[in-house]
Amino acid sequence: MRTHTVVVSAVVLLRLAVVADHAGAQDPPYPAAFVLSSASRVRCLDREARRLMEVAIAASPTIARQVTDLQSTDLIVGVETSSLQRKTRGEARLIGATPAVRHVRITIRIPGARFDLVSVLGHELQHALELAAAPDVRDTVTLRAHYLRIGYEPLGRGYYETDGALEAGRRVSAELAASQPDRRVAAR
């Protein structure tokens, strides 16, 4: 079976605006310890990704809900931190699919300020939820058709963007701004 690698990028061309939407915020039904375990559908692939996820779940009701929502999908989402090209702060890749499960890898570019990294994580988790909502997306052809239907390709070359992911990043930024007076904490 041939594995297709597809990039769903968070090419953030705009500075994230701070908007707040705390209506309907609820505690997630899964504790952070479960979400960070190997039984979770969202798995941290390195130590920095785990630290980032711990901060994100604690500080952002949006991210806590996203991770909870991913538990009931056919996706296994691996989250890692790594260096990426300069214009790309994060990306979600469909890395493979079987009849029962699809694998997505989210990469968050480091180094960076933790506040910004958490916002990018929320953006990329939204892309994972967009994929989860489209069970027919299983390869590069169906992924491209899906993202051209729900979003756009701002820079070409297989990088896609959606208004939903941009909004998720803005919402997470607002949640962090409301909960953390000091945003300058470095990731590394």
Predicted features, each with a name:
Residues 125-141:
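Catalytic Zn2+-binding segment of zinc metalloproteases
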Residues 80-94, 140-188:
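Metalloprotease/metallohydrolase-associated module, dominated by Zn2+-dependent proteases
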Residues 1-4:
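Positively charged n-region of N-terminal signal peptides that target proteins for export
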Residues 121-125, 169:
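Short amphipathic C-terminal alpha-helix that caps PH/PH-like domains
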Residues 7-18:
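Bacterial N-terminal signal peptides
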Residues 21-96, 100:
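A metal-dependent hydrolase signature that marks the N-terminal structural subdomain at the beginning
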